[in-house]
Amino acid sequence: MPETLIKVDLTKSAYENDKVHNRWHPDIPMVEWVNPGDDFIIETYDWTGGFIKNNDSADDVRDIDLSIVHFLSGPIGVKGAEPGDLLVVDLLDVGPLKESLWGFNGFFSKQNGGGFLTDHFPLAQKSIWDIKGLYTSSRHVPGVNFAGLIHPGLIGCLPDPKLLSTWNERETALIATNPTRVPGLANPPFAPTAHAGQAKGDVKAKIGAEGARTVPPREHGGNCDIKDLSRGSKIYFPVYVPGGGLSMGDLHFSQGDGEITFC
């Protein structure tokens, strides 16, 4: 059995786990190192770090602070990987945590996040789905039972300083074209809720001030939400920093490409 490099404790805040982070920045320290060709297991939180609960109220979806997301396990360094290389990642298997066999779907409130269909569905809604093997069903959507295709919505490598600067400049300019749009066109760095993994002191503060938010996909991978990136997939990532810095999270049991189901 491969070694589990990163574990999560669902009874504690994700901020207490120094092997996860919720921003992209070249100075986030590697939490583990592996050799090329190594097999390993990593556990992840859901994208909210456990904020959404298994209950019948959508208040948590309505009230979530969206600046905390996404909580990613990593970064993991690969020995010998250097800028300019391609990091090849084989997803050998993907599955839910045995102690948490459920997931959720929902609509954000128009007052907090919005979505593609926010004018049609302005109020927060949530459904809980119980996972039984390959299938799922929901007490909130009676009569539906279907097989999922489990995949990480978010997987990628750390940017270098130049790429990070490009992202922040590009997204700042995009926001300025329509700063009041709901949902927003992009999300700028936001230090108060940044989790910089094992970074300390001035480095932690720098990551908070400059770290790119994890919402969009970018040149390094990121929040691609490609449903076919499941078990058996082979993914090629450009390496920007020594070691690459692979991170992943935002696991989905079932979702269409692009994540428009969470509208």
Which residues are covered by each model-predicted region?
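Short, conserved secondary-structure segments in the cores of folded domains
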Residues: V20, M30, G74-G77, D225
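Short, Lys/Arg- and Gly-enriched loop/turn segments at beta-strand edges
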Residues: W47-A58, V94-G106, G243-F253
